[in-house]
Structure formats: C-alpha cells, structure tokens
Design a protein with these regions (language model features):
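Conserved alpha-helical substructure of the radical SAM core
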Residues: 1-138, 149-153, 158, 162
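Conserved phosphate-donor/acceptor-positioning beta-strand/loop module used by diverse small-molecule
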Residues: 141-143
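Conserved nucleotide-binding/hydrolysis micro-motifs of P-loop NTPases
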Residues: 146
Length: 164
C-alpha cells in the first residue's frame, strides 16, 4: 500500500467554473453515509441532538438500498461527477456499509474519485485496508487537538491522542 500526504486542495487541476457553466453534471456531490457522530465537537451542529431533532435531521446511517438508488440515479448525469464526497456532518465510519458504498460508486463509474473525511477514532488497520481495497481515493483526517486534554475539551470525547 502506498500513501502520501498531500494538500487538501489541488490548485493545479481545478476546473475554471466560468469555462463550464452552466453545468450538466455536478463537479462534486456530497452524500452523508451517517447523520450520526461519535464526537460532540463544539463547532458542529450534529453534536446538538435537540437541534437535529427540531430541524428533522435523523440520527442514523444511510441504508445501502438508498445509496444504491442514488448511484443508479447518478447514471442519468451526462458524465461522471468529478468527486463523490462520502461525508458531510456525520462520522462516515459509523456506517458498516462504508466500504461497500465506496466499491459500488467506483464499480459503477459514476464518479472519477471518492473521498471522505473522518475523525479517525474508528479507523483501524483492518478497516483502513478494506476501505482502500474498495477504492477510496482520498481520506482526510479531522484532528481536533494535539493532546488528550485538547481532544476532550474540543470534542467532548475521552481519547488517547496517540491512537489517532
């Protein structure tokens, strides 16, 4: 397995929007495999369960059947989306189907790349291998501190920082 650290934004291969609008296919599509999260970060609305209930946002993971329907619908675009981002406000690794979602999107050719952002608390070597084998192109790790104390203060999670 070969991995590299790279900037999150690729300034060299960006599409100048003024050359492609109006778009017939989205460049980037965000799908949230999980509306739930195992952290309670101060900056994130997902940590406020009362607010999430008030706005009608469920606290659950996306069912594979729904993801399969979305992928089937994506085939109606004129071309593949550039990036399918499998994250938004929840922790994507809470979804047990995450590797299968990555694999399906790649196999069906509905996107050029699949990426995700995770707090990495659920990322084990075994899970990492499954996700890589499924075809994930990029994983961003959201680091909420540089010590156990900072993590606890910021995300309300007791965590051994060295485990991330």
């Amino acid at each position: 397995m070969k991995a590299e650290f790279a900037p999150r934004i690729d300034l060299h291969n960006r599409t100048a929007l003024e050359t492609v609008i109006p778009l017939d296919t989205p460049l980037v599509l965000f799908l949230d495999p999980s509306d739930a999260c195992n952290f309670k970060c101060k900056f994130c609305p997902t940590s406020d369960r009362k607010l999430m209930k008030e706005v009608g946002r469920p606290w659950r993971t996306m069912k594979m059947e729904l993801f399969e329907k979305i992928v089937a619908d994506m085939k109606n675009f004129n071309r593949p989306v550039e990036v399918l981002r499998l994250y938004k406000d929840g922790e994507p690794l809470l979804n047990k189907n995450f590797p299968a979602m990555v694999r399906l999107a790649k196999q069906e050719g509905v996107c050029n790349r699949v990426d995700t952002t995770t707090n990495a608390s659920l990322l084990t070597p075994e899970r990492g291998e499954k996700i890589i084998e499924a075809g994930l192109d990029r994983i961003n790790i959201s680091i909420e501190g540089i010590s156990n104390e900072q993590y606890k203060n910021f995300s309300d999670v007791k965590l051994e920082f060295s485990s991330i």
